[in-house]
């Protein structure tokens, strides 16, 4: 089994959902983001999502857009992100890593080369925010050959017929975008999630991770119980950004994010 399958199977036996924190690679710099990445599993991360900085992150709100710009300013490239994953794998070979980004950098890198290099670095899955199912052929064969999961995104506005189409070739887990709009804005109610999840369960047996609009421990607990995982992104980035001075990391940066992550993990595991 893949690391993603192994982790979700283990959590199912434990009777709880997963916590998936997000960090933007090289935000505010390579060393700080790597330090944070390495510390996240001990703070309660079950899987980790790494954002690949991009100059036009259309699905992201101002918080993650600002993080992407800081990452780019610090020299982030797709190759640099893979270097970070390789460094992480020197000390952790169990925690699943998922890259989240946009199609343009992958296309520029070369889809086949990217999938091979990502797998060699220790990446387990990829989420390509702006890649519709109709264009998935660009990556599908290369990803399968490299044993990489392509994580599919579905939303409240996804029709039933579209849902089955999108999830037909899905692997790893399903990322449910629980709100319409950009990241870090609104949040879905428990009632909304309870209404949405059965429809997704009918279309796939894969675990369902709920993201967009999950920011508090209570929301993370609810999402991880109704679904199979809660993804927390903007809330962690906001905390990190609040510790920066002139865009640079301070001694408060990593501890502040880890403290918040520990609180989220405690709620998910309660």
UniProtKB/Swiss-Prot annotation:
GO terms for molecular function: tryptophan synthase activity. The keyword Amino-acid biosynthesis applies. The active site is at 49 (proton acceptor), 60 (proton acceptor). It comes from the Bacteria. Pathway: Amino-acid biosynthesis; L-tryptophan biosynthesis; L-tryptophan from chorismate: step 5/5. It is an enzyme of class 4 (lyase). Signal peptide: none annotated. GO terms for cellular component: cytosol. It catalyses: (1S,2R)-1-C-(indol-3-yl)glycerol 3-phosphate + L-serine = D-glyceraldehyde 3-phosphate + L-tryptophan + H2O. Pfam families: Trp_syntA (PF00290). The keyword Lyase applies. Tetramer of two alpha and two beta chains. Belongs to the TrpA family. The alpha subunit is responsible for the aldol cleavage of indoleglycerol phosphate to indole and glyceraldehyde 3-phosphate. This is Tryptophan synthase alpha chain. It comes from Gluconobacter oxydans (strain 621H) (Gluconobacter suboxydans). The lineage of its organism: Bacteria, Pseudomonadati, Pseudomonadota, Alphaproteobacteria, Acetobacterales. The gene is trpA.
């Amino acid at each position: 089994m893949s690391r993603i399958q192994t982790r979700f199977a283990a959590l199912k036996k434990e009777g709880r959902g997963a916590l998936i924190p997000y960090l933007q690679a090289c935000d505010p710099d390579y060393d700080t983001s790597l330090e944070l990445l390495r510390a996240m599993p001990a703070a309660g991360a079950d899987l980790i999502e790494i954002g690949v900085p991009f100059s036009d992150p259309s699905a992201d709100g101002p918080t993650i857009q600002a993080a992407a710009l800081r990452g780019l300013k610090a020299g982030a490239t797709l190759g640099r992100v893979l270097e970070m994953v390789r460094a992480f794998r020197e000390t952790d070979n169990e925690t699943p890593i998922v890259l989240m980004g946009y199609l343009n950098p992958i296309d520029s890198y070369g889809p086949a080369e990217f999938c091979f290099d990502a797998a060699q670095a220790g990446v387990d899955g990829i989420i390509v925010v702006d890649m519709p199912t109709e264009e998935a052929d660009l990556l599908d064969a290369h990803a399968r050959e490299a044993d990489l999961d392509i994580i599919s995104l579905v939303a409240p506005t996804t029709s039933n017929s579209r849902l089955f189409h999108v999830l037909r070739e899905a692997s790893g887990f399903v990322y449910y975008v629980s709100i319409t709009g950009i990241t870090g804005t609104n949040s879905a109610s428990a009632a909304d999630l309870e209404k949405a999840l059965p429809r997704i369960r009918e279309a796939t047996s894969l675990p369902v991770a709920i993201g967009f609009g999950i920011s508090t421990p209570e929301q993370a607990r609810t999402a991880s119980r109704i679904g199979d995982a809660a993804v927390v992104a903007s809330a962690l980035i906001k905390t990190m950004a609040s510790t920066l001075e002139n865009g640079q990391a301070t001694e408060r940066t990593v501890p502040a994010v880890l403290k918040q992550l520990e609180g989220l993990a405690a709620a998910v595991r309660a």
